[in-house]
Amino acid sequence: MPIKKLISKIVKKKDSDTEKNNYINLSALTEAEREIITNTIELKSKSVREIMVPRVDVVMIPMESSYDKVIKAFNRDRNSRIPVYKDGIDDIVGVLYVKDLIDAEEKNFSLKKILHKPLFVPISISLMELLKNFREKQIHIAMVVDEYGGFSGIVSMEDVLEQIIGDIRDEYDEEDEEIKSNDDGTYLVDARTRIDDFNKYEILPPIPDDEADTVGGFLFSYLGRLPKRNEDIEYNGYSFTVVGKSGNIVTKIRIEKLKKDNTAKNKD
């Protein structure tokens, strides 16, 4: 059975443990194909919260945005789809696709006329159910909302597929490491690094993951506001410095261990 058809079968039906094992143990499958099947089955036990892009890292534009502002947003974000809000970021009214700007005229530009209806999913939905929604509705991006209906982030078809086959990179993706060690003893961290991955580096201070999913999100929740560029934020004997921003979104953070005398002065 072709691997594509096998994945489709798993997504569409509920299987017993025996059937799952049969999928994985099919002798005709290569090791790589068995891994893909295993990863597909595991989508049922993973929630969208684990892979979504949190709201603090999402580039959004207001409904009243001009043609120029929309173009700048796409140039900055390098994504092909951007959420659009009306009365606030919890009021997502549509999604703008970059391809729809091809025939748009700057003179009579109307954002409302070219918006796509957004797909909303609960933060607790499993990745398997999310994948089914994407397939059934022929949509590739969803708005994630919490139990109160507040906007929590976005998740794409690509995010789900990466859970099955690994990272998918395009011409805009950078090859930067999530955590890079510098010769001066400091560390350069991608703000989108997930906290559970960050905490695996035992040489760095562990940070809580109860209020945020990424390192950038942690700084936002820790301060209670958006961090400023070049702002030093002290936490647990370390200095977190925002060295990269794109609009309001933190992109790069430099982390260094504070000297004992500096730590003592701060305590005084």
Curated annotation (Swiss-Prot):
Give me the Gene Ontology terms describing cellular component.
plasma membrane
* Ranges in a coiled coil: none
Q: Which InterPro entries match?
A: CBS_dom, CBS_dom_sf, FAD-bd_PCMH-like_sf, FAD-bd_PCMH_sub2, Ion_transp-like_CBS, Transptr-assoc_dom
CBS domain spans which residues? 52-111, 114-171
The organism's place on the tree of life at top rank: Bacteria
The reply to whether tRNA-binding figures as a keyword in the UniProt entry is no
Any single GO molecular-function term of the entry would be: flavin adenine dinucleotide binding
Alphabetized, the UniProt keywords read:
CBS domain, Cytolysis, Hemolysis, Repeat, Toxin, Virulence
Q: Might you name a Gene Ontology BP term for this protein?
A: killing of cells of another organism
Query: Nucleotide-binding as a keyword?
Result: no
Similarity comment: family membership: Belongs to the UPF0053 family.
**What exactly does this protein do?**
Bacterial hemolysins are exotoxins that attack blood cell membranes and cause cell rupture by mechanisms not clearly defined.
Its protein name is Hemolysin C
Gene that encodes the chain: tlyC
